[in-house]
Design a protein with these regions (language model features):
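Active-site-adjacent structural elements in enzyme catalytic cores
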Residues: 1-193
Length: 193
């Protein structure tokens, strides 16, 4: 697999969009601090620029490099990450304003999919990762679907299997109370008890 990860890293370093499996759906990825690639990602997705992308990391301890998290949420983070959980948190100054749409809030996820984790560890930098689909369309569940949707707009596709096909649950932990933003495979009640 290292060969495909190297190809993915080369593409990312050249401001290109890659695709890879997560445990939920296939995702598209660019380096979080590459504005040129970010703009290309918006074009590929045909997405309005008012919805921030999730930032994917390879390990829990990396969250604290990019976000400020209230200690009371650490138990939930350590129990459910990696996994189908996206947390909305206050970003640190090293996260570019265009990533958060100047809100100072970023969605962070650590996937549990083997290929996704290996890729993230290999490239050694967070990726902005929306689902692999055009705006308002169904996300790709296989590498073949990624190619059918995007053709040569995606330079490297990492092959692998998704697990569920259901997008991650999103919770907002920027304030004193945990808030549900989007339902997902993990019941909110399980997180918020």
């Amino acid at each position: 697999m290292n060969k495909i990860y190297q190809e993915a890293l080369d593409a990312l370093n050249n401001h290109q969009v890659i695709a890879f499996p997560t445990e939920t759906v296939f995702g598209l990825g660019v380096f979080y601090d590459d504005q040129k690639a970010y703009e290309l990602l918006n074009a590929v997705k045909r997405r309005r620029e008012d919805k921030p992308y999730t930032m994917m990391l390879s390990k829990v301890e990396d969250i604290f490099k990019y976000a400020d998290v209230d200690d009371k949420y650490l138990k939930v983070i350590k129990k459910y990450m990696p996994g189908s959980l996206t947390i909305l948190v206050k970003s640190k100054d090293n996260v570019p304003g265009y990533v958060t749409h100047n809100t100072g809030i970023i969605g962070i996820r650590i996937p549990s999919n083997k290929e996704a984790l290996e890729l993230l560890a290999f490239v050694k930098k967070p990726l902005l990762v929306p689902s692999a689909n055009r705006a308002d369309q169904i996300p790709a569940l296989t590498s073949e679907e990624v190619v059918a949707i995007f053709g040569d707009e995606i330079k490297v596709v990492v092959h692998g299997q998704i697990q569920s096909g259901e997008p991650s649950i999103i919770i907002d932990i920027t304030g004193p109370e945990m808030k549900l933003v989007r339902k997902g495979p993990i019941p909110f009640e399980e997180l918020n008890h």
